[in-house]
A protein has these predicted regions:
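Boundary/linker segments flanking structured domains
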Residues: 1-58, 62-142
Length: 142
């Protein structure tokens, strides 16, 4: 399994990021005694319903501390809890995972710029920047 972005001839981080090559971790990874990732990262939360050929990208985020980002409060955690509860009520299976790309700029401004480019490219429904487009019932802005 790859644990960071896959490198190519291009220096463009958007072109290097291959989400499906990144190692999927359970959303509870932050409870592990040792984190598999440290430092700056872009992270992606995906669901892989068994009836779909491709996973669903739900959220794109960035952090300076991959090993600590999800330990505290995080809006996306509550969105994912609501999403999971709804799927269970409807008897629909899900396979949620989080994937980290640690081959990103350490400088917060540049990393956030990359995060915003990815959000605009992929339009994940749980990011606040795309809520008007998707009007998902799982986020705080109803």
């Amino acid at each position: 399994h790859k644990t960071s972005c896959e490198h190519s001839a291009s220096d463009d981080p958007l072109r290097r990021l291959k989400p499906l090559v990144l190692r999927p971790l359970p959303l509870s990874f932050w409870r592990w005694p040792e984190s598999p990732h440290r430092g700056a990262a872009i992270y992606l939360v995906l669901d892989r319903p068994p009836h779909l050929d491709q996973p669903l990208l739900l959220y794109v985020g960035e952090t300076l501390a991959a090993d600590r980002r999800w330990k505290g409060d995080h809006d996306c955690k509550s969105y994912l809890a609501a999403y999971g509860e709804t799927l269970q009520r409807c008897q629909l299976p899900s396979q949620l995972s989080i994937r980290f790309c640690c081959d990103v700029p350490r400088a917060t401004r540049h990393r956030r710029g990359l995060e915003q480019e990815l959000i605009q490219r992929w339009l994940p429904p749980f990011n606040k920047e795309t809520r008007q487009r998707w009007a998902t019932p799982f986020t705080a802005d109803r």
